[in-house]
From Swiss-Prot:
Belongs to the fatty acid desaturase type 1 family. GO terms for cellular component: membrane. Its EC number is 1.14.19.-. This is Omega-3 fatty acid desaturase fat-1. HPO-19 and T05H4.4 are cytochrome b5 reductases required for PUFA desaturation in Caenorhabditis elegans. HPO-19 knockdown or mutation alters FAT-1 desaturase activity. Although FAT-1 lacks a cytochrome b5 domain, its N-terminal contains a DUF3474 domain that may possess some oxidoreductase activity for electron transfer, obviating the need for an extra cytochrome b5 enzyme, but still requiring cytochrome b5 reductase HPO-19/T05H4.4 to become activated. It is a multi-pass membrane protein. It comes from Caenorhabditis elegans. It is found in: Membrane. Keywords: Fatty acid biosynthesis, Fatty acid metabolism, Lipid biosynthesis, Lipid metabolism, Membrane, Oxidoreductase, Transmembrane, Transmembrane helix. GO terms for molecular function: oxidoreductase activity. The lineage of its organism: Eukaryota, Metazoa, Ecdysozoa, Nematoda, Chromadorea. Pfam families: FA_desaturase (PF00487). It catalyses: (9Z,12Z)-octadecadienoyl-CoA + 2 Fe(II)-[cytochrome b5] + O2 + 2 H(+) = (9Z,12Z,15Z)-octadecatrienoyl-CoA + 2 Fe(III)-[cytochrome b5] + 2 H2O; (8Z,11Z,14Z)-eicosatrienoyl-CoA + 2 Fe(II)-[cytochrome b5] + O2 + 2 H(+) = (8Z,11Z,14Z,17Z)-eicosatetraenoyl-CoA + 2 Fe(III)-[cytochrome b5] + 2 H2O; (5Z,8Z,11Z,14Z)-eicosatetraenoyl-CoA + 2 Fe(II)-[cytochrome b5] + O2 + 2 H(+) = (5Z,8Z,11Z,14Z,17Z)-eicosapentaenoyl-CoA + 2 Fe(III)-[cytochrome b5] + 2 H2O; (7Z,10Z,13Z,16Z)-docosatetraenoyl-CoA + 2 Fe(II)-[cytochrome b5] + O2 + 2 H(+) = (7Z,10Z,13Z,16Z,19Z)-docosapentaenoyl-CoA + 2 Fe(III)-[cytochrome b5] + 2 H2O. The chain crosses the membrane at residues 79-99, 101-121, 235-255, 260-280.
Length: 402
């Protein structure tokens, strides 16, 4: 049984840095009485022990206050640092190409890593953790996102929904959670295509932003992602910025061939890093996904996984890999405070270390192989109990181990 603290989630607590959707959800949870998450269980054979989930306020108290402070100078330094790294890589391109196709591949990998690092700085902007001025955040966010052909305002909208409803089976649109019923309804070609190791890369970038499989196109102002006219205007503004950057790249390249090989291909490697990192932050054998009656903000965030990639990648990508759990509880914490904030989160979750809701962290030097393997293995979700889902293969392995 999982019960929420009698405090509930304070409606005034900075659940995700002031996101309206989460504040509203928190207000509802404040009224909830403790409940048995295994009520009406379909498959459970034993009753789980009673577990008291911490409140958001408990996490906030455990994190040093200065972790919530934004330093504009430091934020700009990281922005300049990432642009400088990408510029240096372009100047160093002839040295890489000296080694032929292998050198070109290595160059693209570096471009993908540093492109994703720039994306993380823009990601701070859309959360409001770049500076105290949201207008400045939005301006800088476009500077960071547009060269990456990532429309800033639409990303801001869809990403806030992901944070507000993490691991909610219906409302978390950051990932397409495929259920058994979805799998059965799929055409055979799609069931064949999904397990292909690189299918995640092919599906999510740039097809995801262009066509929007689960939450609507990020470029089309009349897609299902946008409700208000102001959002549609923002979509157009961000889309124009992306197209302007792509045109500037074409002008500099001098030909469509050069534009493809030296702008679009490295852009696709950025997309690969984006897919790998975001996928592994939330997809794992142990992760649970919840239906509406079983979901809560804290419960969903505890399924997030910190992964240490090593080789300097975590520092280069601003610790969005190994500080992601803290980021999900408080997304207004700047990336340069995430590791310190993580220590506070770990202390709060320590009493739950032997449960499904403990702090989840892995050292994954094999992150690329793990991404490919999970994309093949973790095909669809089935009910673990009523309202609680896990991947089919996870439950089958548990059943065989008994």
């Amino acid at each position: 049984m999982v019960a929420h603290s009698s405090e509930g989630l304070s409606a005034t607590a900075p659940v995700t840095g002031g996101d309206v959707l989460v504040d509203a959800r928190a207000s509802l949870e404040e009224k909830e009485a403790p409940r048995d998450v295994n009520a009406n269980t379909k498959q459970a054979t034993t009753e789980e022990p009673r577990i008291q989930l911490p409140t958001v306020d408990a996490f906030r108290r455990a994190i040093p206050a200065h972790c919530f402070e934004r330093d504009l100078v430091k934020s700009i330094r990281y922005l300049v640092q990432d642009f400088a790294a990408l510029t240096i890589l372009y100047f160093a391109l002839p040295a890489f190409e000296y080694f032929g196709l292998f050198g070109y591949l290595v160059w693209n990998i570096f471009m993908g890593v540093f492109g994703f690092a720039l994306f993380v700085v823009g990601h701070d902007c859309l959360h409001g953790s770049f500076s105290d001025n949201q207008n400045l955040n939005d301006f800088i966010g476009h500077i960071a996102f547009s060269p990456l052909f990532s429309p800033y305002f639409p990303w801001q909208k869809s990403h806030k929904l992901h944070h507000a409803f993490t691991n909610h089976i219906d409302k978390d649109h950051g990932h397409v959670w495929i259920q058994d019923k979805d799998w059965e309804a799929m055409p055979s070609w799609k069931r064949w295509f999904n397990p292909i190791p690189f299918s995640g890369w092919l599906k999510w970038f740039p097809v995801y932003t262009l066509f929007g499989f689960c939450d609507g196109s990020h470029f089309w102002p009349y897609s299902s992602l946008f409700v208000r006219n102001s959002e549609r205007v923002q979509c157009v503004i961000s889309g124009i910025c992306c197209c302007v950057c792509a045109y500037i790249a074409l002008t500099i390249a001098g030909s469509y061939s050069n534009w493809f090989w030296y702008y679009w291909v490295p852009l696709s490697f950025f997309g690969l890093m984006l897919v790998i990192v975001t996928y592994l932050q939330h997809v794992d054998d142990v992760a649970e996904v919840y239906e509406a009656d079983e979901w809560s903000f804290v419960r969903g965030q505890t399924q997030t996984i910190d992964r240490y990639y090593g080789l300097g990648l975590d520092t280069t990508m601003h610790h969005i890999t190994d500080g992601h759990v803290a980021h999900h509880f408080f997304n207004k914490i700047p990336h340069y405070h995430l590791i310190e904030a993580t220590e506070g989160v770990k202390k709060v979750l320590e009493p739950l270390s032997d449960t499904q809701y403990g702090y989840k962290s892995q050292v994954n030097y094999d992150f690329f192989a793990r991404f490919l393997w999970f994309n093949y293995k973790l095909d669809y979700l089935v009910h673990k109990t009523a309202g609680i889902m896990q991947f089919r293969t996870t439950l089958e392995e548990k059943a065989k181990a008994k």
